[in-house]
Amino acid sequence: MAGTRSAARTTPAPDLRACLGAVDNDRRLQVMEWLKAPTRHFPPQVEGDLQRDGVCGALIAEKLGVSQPTVSEHMRLLVSSGLVTAKKIKQWTFYKRNEPVIRAFTRRMREEL
C-alpha cells in the first residue's frame, strides 16, 4: 500500500485545463470508458495485447463510427493531456489509459474544487 501511495505522489500534477479539455467531448469520454476494460469492449487484435499494449486506433475508429483522422485527433488530445498513452507497434498506434495521471487528475480536481 505504501508503494502505491509513493508512486501516486511522484506522478506530476497534470494540467487541469488540458485534462478538462480532453474529456470535454462525448466521444473522448466514451473512449476513456472503453479503455477501462478493453477486453470487454474490443475484439482480440492481430498486433498488440489489449491489456498490455492498449487498443489499436483503427479499432477505436471503427467502434466510434468515425474516420481514422478523426479518431487520431481525439486521441492526440487525450495523449497530450497525459490521460492516455500511445505506443507504436509496426505501423499502428495503440492507446491505453494512464492510470497514475488519471488518479492525480481526480485528486487535483477534489483539491481545487
How should each PLM-predicted stretch be described?
Residues 82-84, 90-91, 107:
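Short, Lys/Arg-enriched C-terminal cap helix and immediately downstream tail that follows
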